[in-house]
C-alpha cells in the first residue's frame, strides 16, 4: 500500500468567544448587587467610561444594540449550552461543566447559605407549584438564626392561600435540616429537635413549656410539673442544654444582603399587568467620545494608541452589554407574568406548571439565556418578592423519551424500593438508579441521594449496618436463656 501526500482545503465557520462576548454572557447571570460592583471596577480602570448624569458633557448615549451583536450573543449561548456550560433548571446554582472561564462561580465567589440549604430541600419536598411558592415565601422570612416571625397570618393573605395551606407547608419545613429550623419561638425550636430525637414525652413537654422556671432556676417547681425525681430532672435539663437554640447559625454569620427587586409588576388600568425594570438597579454608564477624540490627537506612541483603542472598545461593549441585559430581563419577566397571570390575579393556587423551554420558545430566545436571566433576579409583585426562577417547576425526564415523570412520583418510587429491599440485599444509590432506569425513569445518582436524604432515609452503608446490629441483637436476646 503506497503512501501519498495531498493538500486539502476546507472551509468552515466557527464562533470565536471574544472577551467582550464572554463578558456579555456573564453579565446576564449577575445579581444587581454584583453587577454594581462589577461596573464600579470597570469605572475605576477604564478612563473612557463614566457615570451618566443629566449634565454629562461630551458623553454620547449608548448606541442601539445592533442585530449582529445580539445574534452573536445568542449563538455564543447556544454553543455554550452544547459545551455543557449552561445552567439547567435541575441544577440551579450548580454551574456547568465547561471551561472555568465561563463559570460564574469563578467570577463571583459564593457559599451555601441557610436559605440555599432550605430551598434545595424544598425542591424535593414539594412538586405542586402552589406549595413550593408558599414554602419559598416562608423560607425568605427565616432569619439568620433559623427562626420565622411569630405571626404568619399575613403570609396566607399575601399569597391568596388558606391558613391551612400555610400551616401544612410550615409543618413540612419544620422537618428540614438543620433540626429546629423554621420554628417561631424557642419552645417550638426545642420541641422540634426533641421530636426528631424521639424524646418529646409528656415530662419533657412540660419542661419545654416552662422555660421561664428554668431561667429562674426553680428546679423544685419544674420537678413537680414534670412528675419526675431529682435525678431525672437533672438529666432532662442536661439533655435540653445539648440542643441548639439557634440552628441556623451553623451556616456561618455571613451578613444577609437586602433583597432589591430587578422588576416591578403592578396592576395596569386595563386589568392586565404593567412590568417595568427597577431603574435603581441599572448602572448608567456612557462612553466619553469627546475625551477620546481629544486624546487621540495628542497621543503619539503606538502603545498608547493601542491602550486607548482597547479602552474605547471595552467601554462600548460594556454599554451595549448592559443595555442588552436590561432588555433581556424585561422580555423574560414580561413573558413570565403573561404565563402566570392566574397567580398574580387569584393567588398561589393558580400558579401553573412552567419550564424554561416554554418561555424561551415564546420569546424566541435560547433556554440558556432564560436560565441565566432568571438566576439571582427578583420580581416585586402584589403578593411579595420572588426570584424569577421560582415561577418554574421541574420534572424528571423519561428514559425512553416518553412523558416526563413528576419529582413527587419519583421520590415515592425511591421510597418504595428502599422499603421493599431485603435486609441481606440493601440497595445502593447506583442500584436504585438502575432500577428506575429499567422502569423508564432517567435520573442521576446525585439526584437519588438528594431525594433520599430529604426523606430522612439513611444511606445504604448505614442501613446495612443497622440491619447487622438488629440481627445480632435478635440472636443475642433469643439465645441467652435469661428468660427462664
Curated annotation (Swiss-Prot):
DNA-binding region coordinates: 355-374
GO biological process: DNA-templated transcription initiation; nitrogen fixation; regulation of DNA-templated transcription
A Gene Ontology term for the protein's cellular component: DNA-directed RNA polymerase complex
Annotated GO MF terms: DNA-binding transcription activator activity; nucleotidyltransferase activity; sigma factor activity; transcription cis-regulatory region binding
Residue interval(s) of motif RPON box: 444-452
Role according to the record: Sigma factors are initiation factors that promote the attachment of RNA polymerase to specific initiation sites and are then released. This sigma factor is responsible for the expression of the nitrogen fixation genes.
Protein family: Belongs to the sigma-54 factor family.
Protein's name in the database: RNA polymerase sigma-54 factor 1
Originating gene: rpoN1
Amino acid at each position: 500500500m503506497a503512501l501519498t501526500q495531498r493538500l486539502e482545503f476546507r472551509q468552515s465557520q466557527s464562533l470565536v468567544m471574544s472577551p467582550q462576548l464572554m463578558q456579555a454572557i456573564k453579565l446576564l447571570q449577575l445579581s444587581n448587587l454584583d453587577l454594581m460592583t462589577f461596573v464600579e471596577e470597570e469605572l475605576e480602570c477604564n478612563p473612557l467610561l463614566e457615570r451618566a448624569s443629566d449634565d454629562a458633557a461630551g458623553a454620547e448615549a449608548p448606541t442601539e444594540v445592533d442585530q449582529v451583536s445580539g445574534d452573536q450573543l445568542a449563538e455564543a449561548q447556544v454553543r455554550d449550552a452544547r459545551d455543557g456550560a449552561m445552567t439547567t433548571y435541575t441544577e440551579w446554582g450548580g454551574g456547568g461543566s465547561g471551561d472555568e472561564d465561563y463559570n460564574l462561580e469563578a467570577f463571583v465567589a459564593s457559599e451555601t447559605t441557610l436559605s440555599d440549604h432550605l430551598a434545595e430541600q424544598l425542591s424535593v419536598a414539594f412538586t405542586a407549584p402552589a406549595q413550593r411558592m408558599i414554602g419559598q415565601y416562608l423560607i425568605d422570612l427565616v432569619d439568620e438564626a433559623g427562626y420565622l416571625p411569630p405571626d404568619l397570618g399575613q403570609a396566607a393573605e399575601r399569597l391568596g392561600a388558606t391558613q391551612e395551606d400555610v400551616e401544612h407547608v410550615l409543618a413540612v419545613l419544620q422537618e428540614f435540616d438543620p433540626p429546629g429550623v423554621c420554628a417561631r419561638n424557642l419552645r417550638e425550636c426545642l420541641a422540634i429537635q426533641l421530636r426528631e430525637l424521639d424524646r418529646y414525652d409528656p415530662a419533657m413537654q412540660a419542661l419545654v413549656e416552662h422555660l421561664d422556671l428554668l431561667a429562674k432556676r426553680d428546679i423544685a417547681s419544674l420537678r413537680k410539673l414534670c412528675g419526675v425525681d431529682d435525678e431525672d430532672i437533672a438529666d432532662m435539663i442536661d439533655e435540653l442544654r445539648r440542643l441548639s437554640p439557634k440552628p441556623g447559625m451553623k451556616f456561618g454569620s455571613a451578613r444577609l444582603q437586602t433583597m432589591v427587586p430587578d422588576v416591578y409588576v403592578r396592576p395596569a388600568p386595563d386589568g392586565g399587568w404593567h412590568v417595568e425594570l427597577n431603574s435603581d438597579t441599572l448602572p448608567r454608564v456612557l462612553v466619553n467620545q469627546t475625551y477620546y477624540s481629544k486624546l487621540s490627537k495628542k497621543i503619539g506612541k503606538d502603545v498608547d494608541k493601542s491602550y486607548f483603542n482597547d479602552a474605547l472598545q471595552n467601554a462600548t461593549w460594556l454599554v451595549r452589554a448592559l443595555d442588552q441585559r436590561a432588555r433581556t430581563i424585561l422580555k423574560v419577566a414580561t413573558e413570565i407574568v403573561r404565563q402566570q397571570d392566574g397567580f398574580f390575579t387569584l393567588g398561589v393556587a393558580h400558579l401553573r406548571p412552567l419550564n424554561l423551554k416554554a418561555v424561551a420558545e415564546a420569546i424566541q430566545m435560547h433556554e440558556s439565556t432564560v436560565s441565566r436571566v432568571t438566576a439571582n433576579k427578583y420580581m416585586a409583585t402584589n403578593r411579595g418578592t420572588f426570584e424569577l426562577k421560582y415561577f418554574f417547576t421541574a420534572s424528571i425526564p423519561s428514559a425512553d423519551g416518553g412523558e416526563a415523570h413528576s419529582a413527587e412520583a419519583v421520590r415515592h418510587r425511591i421510597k418504595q424500593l428502599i422499603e421493599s429491599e431485603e435486609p441481606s440485599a440493601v440497595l445502593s444509590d447506583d442500584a436504585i438508579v438502575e432500577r428506575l432506569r429499567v422502569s423508564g425513569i432517567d435520573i442521576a445518582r446525585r439526584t437519588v441521594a438528594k431525594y433520599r436524604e430529604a426523606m430522612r432515609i439513611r444511606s445504604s452503608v448505614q442501613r446495612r449496618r443497622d440491619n447487622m446490629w438488629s440481627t445480632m441483637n435478635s440472636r443475642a436476646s433469643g439465645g441467652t436463656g435469661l428468660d427462664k
